[in-house]
Amino acid sequence: MQSVFEQIARSLKKRRAMLFVGAGVSMSVGLPPWRKLIEHMADDLGLDDQTVGMPDTTYQALAEYYRLKHGSIGPLRSWMDREWSVSRDKVKRSEIHKLIVSLDFPIIYTTNYDRNLEAAFEIYGRPFVKIANAKDIAKVNGDLTQIIKYHGDFDDDTSLVLAETDYFDRLSFDSPLDVKFRADALGRTILFVGYSMSDMNIRLLLHRLWQTWRLSGYERDRPKSFVFMPGPNVVQEAVLGRWGLNVVAGDDEDPQQSLAAFLS
C-alpha cells in the first residue's frame, strides 16, 4: 500500500491534487488570533466584557452587529487589512510558505483573508492567478497556480465571508466559488492543512463532498483526501474517516514545526 506521501506525490505529478490552507498557516508567521478581532470590534462598538463573553456572542455575530451599526464592513476590513498583514521578510523566512510554493499544487484554496500566500509566490518568482469572486474565475489559466480566496479577500469588501449573514449565505453552497470548488474537488486528491476542524462551514463542505460521492453510486472511485492535524485526535479521525477523509497526525508539540515536518 502506498504511503500518504506517495499518494500525494503521485497526484501532484499528474496535476490532480489541490491544497486547502487554513488559519494555522497564517498564524505561523505571526498573524493575530481571532480573539484580537473580537476585542477590536467590542471596543469599537462600546460593548462590555460580559456581553462579549456570552457563549452565543460569536465573532460572526459581532461582525454582523458591526455592519448594522456602521452601515458596512468597510472600516473593519480596513483595520483587518492593517493588522492582518506581516512583512514580506517574515513570509520569506517561513519554512511552511516556502514548502507550499515548492510543492507546486496547481490549485490552492484558502479561507484566510491575508495576502501571505500571494506574497510567498511572488517572493519565489512563481506566477499565479488569484480568484476571490466570479469575475476572477474568467482569469483562470491552466498553466498558472490558482489561489482561490474561498472566504474573500481584503481587496474586495463584498467578497469577504466574515459576518453571520455571509456564513449563512455560504451554507447554501451555490455561489460561483462553491460551484468551482465542487468541480475542482470531485476529481482531485485534497490536502487540508492549518485547520482545527472547528469551522462548521468547512466541516459542512467536507460532508457535502462526501455526500455527493455517496449519492453518485461511485464512492469507491473517489480520490483520496487527507487532513493534516498537529497531533492525534481519535474523535476527528473517526468522524472525518466516516466522510472518506484520512487524518494524518503530526508528532511535534509545536503545531508549526509539526506541519513543516510533514510538508517537507
Q: Each predicted region: which residue ranges?
A:
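Active-site periphery "cap/insert" segments of enzyme catalytic domains
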Residues: 11, 71-139, 161, 169
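SIR2/sirtuin-family catalytic core signature
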Residues: 1-19, 25-29, 40, 44, ...
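A phosphate-binding glycine/aspartate-rich beta-alpha loop in the early core of alpha/beta enzymes
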Residues: 19, 27, 31-84, 127, ...
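Glycine-centered structural positions embedded in regular secondary structure
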Residues: 61, 89, 225-227
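Short, structured patches in soluble enzyme cores that scaffold and shape functional sites
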Residues: 149-154, 164, 229
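A short, charged helix-loop
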Residues: 157-177
